[in-house]
Every structure is written in C-alpha cells, then in structure tokens.
Amino acid sequence: MGMAAEVRMVLYEDDSVQVHYACGSTLQLSPCGSEFLFEKALPPSTHPLEQPERIRQRTHFVISNYREQLQRALDFRNSSATCPFLSESIIPPERKKHIFIDFSEVEWPSLDRDDCIMYSESGVVKITSLDGHAYLCLPRSQHEFTVHFLCKVSQRPDSSGILSETQNQDPKNKLVEKTRKVCRCGNLSEQTLRNKENEPPYQILKSKNASVNTCCVNDSEGRGELPSLGTNHRCVYAWVKQAWSVAACPEAWKHPLSLALRFYNKVRAASEIDADFPASSIVTSDCPEERGTEVSVLPRALLLSCPAPHMHRWTFCDSLLQRQPDAEDFSYPELVKVVWYKGVTYRLTHKNVNSIEIFPGDGSVFKSEGAHFGNYFTYYPSQEESEKREEKTYSVNNLPPDRPGNFFSVRSLIKQATRILQHCAKIRLSLSHNYRVCCWKMAPGVSVSTILPVLLKESLIPGVGRFLAYSDDKVHAVFLDGVTVTLNWHLSSSAEKKQVDQGLSFGWCRLTFPDGQDQLIPTEHPGAYERYVTSVISWCRGLTQTSPRQVPTHLSPALKENWSVASELEKIQKFNWLLENSGVLNLTSSKNEQCSGHCKSGSSETLLEATNEERVSVALKRTSEILQDIDRLLSLSRK
C-alpha cells in the first residue's frame, strides 16, 4: 500500500511518537514502542461526523501494509529515546548482527590515550570503543553528536539473555566475571538470571583499571569450557543510531564525548602550529603499555510486550481538524523532546528551563538564548560558512523578512520553535501531574502515589486568595475573583541563592479565568495581570526565605499513606453522619439507632466537633419547616 511521506514527527518526553503524513493520516506509537495506532485520513467528501478508520496492532506482529511506516517511526523514536525498542521481525537484515557473546557494556580508551580515534578531512572526530561495539562521531561544529552502538533486540518477558551482574560484585571480581558471560539464549535452564527489582534500564558511566577481552571464556579453576556455539546459542544484536545535543549529553556517552572534545582541541592546536599536519589520519598511542579504560553500560532494549499496556494513551483528532494538518501541532499532553518538521529538527532539553536547538539541515544551528529562553535565538553558521558569516542574534518580536534564494526561512523556523516552547510551558504549568507516569517506567510493586507530587505548603490570605505549593516545584494560587495562577518555583532550600527566582527564570506563568479560558503570561511583563503575578511571586519568595524545617521538601511514604487514609476515613464518616441525620432516607428506627450507635462508638468526639451537629440540625429543621409551608400554600391554591 502506498503511503504519503512524513510531514511532522514528534517525540515526547515519555518516548511516545506521533507521525503526521501529507495525506492527513497519523500514526501514534506507545511510549514503550510495543503498540501503535494508525488513523487513516478521511476523503474530502466524507460526512463531518463520520469517524476515520483506526488500526491498532502490536508492533511485533505488524502487517506488511504498515511495516515501512512503523519502521521509520521506530527509528525516529530510538534516535533520542532513553531505551530503544528493537523488534527483530521489522529490523532490516543489514542492521542485524549475530554474536556468540552476551554483552551490555563497552570499553573506551582512557583520556591519556588516542587509540581507536580517527578524524576526517571534514573535521569529524570518531571515537571507537576497544571492542568495536560502539563509536561516537563529533562534527567540527560541536553542537551535536551521533553515536552508533550494538544493542540486543527486544526479548519476550519469559526469555531474556544473561543480564549484567556487575552491580553486586567487587571491582576485582567484575573483570573475571565479565569474561564468563557467554550467551546461551537457546537454553535458559542452564543460566542463573539475576536482575534486581526496580533496576533502571541503563546505568551510569563506570571506570576500570584494565581492559578485558570479552570474547574469551576464562575460569580460574580451569573448569570453564566453551559451549557448543550452534545457531540456537547466538544472540541477535542490531545497530542503533542516536543523536544528542552536546549541551545535554547522557551519562553513558559523557566519557567518549569528552575524549572527542579533548582530541579535537589537540588536532586544532597542532594544525595551527604545523601547517603540514595531515588533514585525516589514525592516531595511535605513543605508549604501548596497558592503561586504564572507561566502561559505559549500553542502553538496554525494552521488552516486546509492555508491562502496563493499560497506561497507553491515544489521541483521536476531530474529523474537521484532521483536514487541516497545521491546526493543532501537539495534541498529546506531554513535554516535547524532538520534533522533525519538513526536514528541520528541533531538539529540546527540560532541566530547569525549556531550551531548544534548531538544526535546519545545512550544518548551522539556532539556539535559544537570553534570560527567558525563547525570546532570543543565536544563529551559528555551518563550519564551511563560518569564515564568511558571523554569529547573529534574533529577537522573537523583531524577526527579519524572508529573502529569496535562502536555504530556509528564519522567520518560520523561529516561529515554529516558539510554538513548541509555548506548548511545553503549558504542559509544565498544568495541574494534571500525570506527565511523569509512563508505562515502561512502572516497575512491579511501585505505587503511582509515590510518583505524584505532594502538597508542601498551603496558605489562606484574607482578602487575596488561597496559595498552594507542591513538591514538583509547582505553585498554584486561587484568587477570590476566580482567577487562578500557576507557575514553577524552586522550593528546595534557601541555600541555593542562584535559583531563588526560579519562577522568573522560567519566564512564564499560566492564568486561568473563571470562564475556563487560560493564557500564558510572561512573569517579567505581566501587563494588566501584574497584581496576580506579583502576589504569587511575593508569596514564593517568602517561602524560600523561611527555614528548611518550616517548608518540608518531601514526605515519607508512611506519612503520606497515613495522611491519605485518615483523610478518606474522615470524609466517609462525615458523609455517613450527614446522610443518617438528614432524613433523606426513610430508614426504620432500628436501623437508625444501630447506625447512629456505630458512628458514636467509632469517632463521635472528633466527628461532632468537626461538623458541628447543632448547626446542621438547625439548618435541617428550618429546611423542613420551609418545605411544610410550601406544601400548605400548594394545598390552599388547589382549593
């Protein structure tokens, strides 16, 4: 089946993907990658109320009609995902590799060595691991880098290879145990699988003092023998390509990236001194003796089946809006990580603030700059044009007009980036609190309540409104006129002077009006809403200036559990008391006495004090008298 080309591909923070095609069709990929939903475009003559055809399938069992589209969507996901999803059934044969060993980490040269380091005439530095299972490429611009590594394909939950066991071992035993890890994928009964619960799918960078050849089998007691390496014992690996920003490098690639940056500086310094320095070469170490190496644990592929498929969320577009591809760019309530739109890549980072980088495709890059990220963009030309063109800074409020013959439109690129930043600002200022819950992050035995934020501080200011602060640095204020303000503010402690005005550094706050409409307002220039923003910021500054003992940063799980149970029981007791004493239900006297006795025996003292029985009884008595008067008037009017 022929399919139109992709127009927009969006990767969200939970690693879910949305793909929009030129024909109007859409493809959604679950965060774990194990399931997808394809929504076909409706013809122009279709009735507006007719729903489009939707196909929902498991990724591992995709039919041939959607195989190519799903493969490109998975490649886009795996290029920037925390954990790749690699289904053996849809990976091309040229990207597969059968290996007789099971490995989950690679060794890199140390900082004082230049082994396995290459650079080309174009200025690209290539760092290759000692075992050849991964390599990193850093271009001369040094804004982003790509990494290629071998990753074991996704396995079924009941059959997986031997996992890394180096976490519970001594450093001396790690090197010996690493040489014993021979893959036996065909017979799991001969293995001893040990995997810690709640272990993250990837580990941080580790260091070792010596390199070990993982292709051999070693046993200090002389009892180790190579097993029969037949076809059933081979592990299937696939090459994965990822692209990351140098400013937001994952832990696993920090050492090879630092090695590439250090080596590039050496090459540039040598070329300035010696004009005859070769433009491309392979540089080896001057000292042949063995030296220390660095070990990175590779990202581990997710399972073929999702552990929590009930958490998959699908967005269904309106049939009228679906005919307008640019009507709604981001309908998924999640932070955006990467956007590919008509050949241009937008890469975002979400640490303390939302920052974005734009890669038009010609080697140049735009970066959001300024006190409020997103108000200014700095243009860095490509390396070939760096001698002719200088760096420029553009303001969002004063963009230059488009010039004929340019490779791209600066105005359209920055406007698109601004829309992405505004979407992320709305998500960060949302009170849904569910964007951190993800299906592949839900380990067995982990409660969702431990992930959701907790109320840290609540204040009721007379004549102003109610202010609340949560553990996820989110502040919510409800004013007496019905206007609500939400912003982010760092509440960890007053010792961090640099982040006292974290809400201001974010640059935006969200106002919700009584009619339900909301609007993003810059905190530095709120305009007509200055009194709302100023009141919230003043209250936040008062919180950061208090002692850490007065503002708790977190609650223990036991305290949170007791607090939630007590509050729910109190609500149930109040509801039961009001129901039994309001006379709404015509219960028998015996049942009323039994229920009232049960309530009194439970918590009569605290309950009567909380609800104030006398006021409730007086109000009910007056209500009954009014109803009797109404009945009398109705009876008299009928006569």
Swiss-Prot record:
Transmembrane segments: none
Highest taxon of the lineage: Eukaryota
Pfam families: C5orf34-like_N, C5orf34_2nd, C5orf34_C, Polo_box_4
Protein name as it appears in the record: Uncharacterized protein C5orf34 homolog
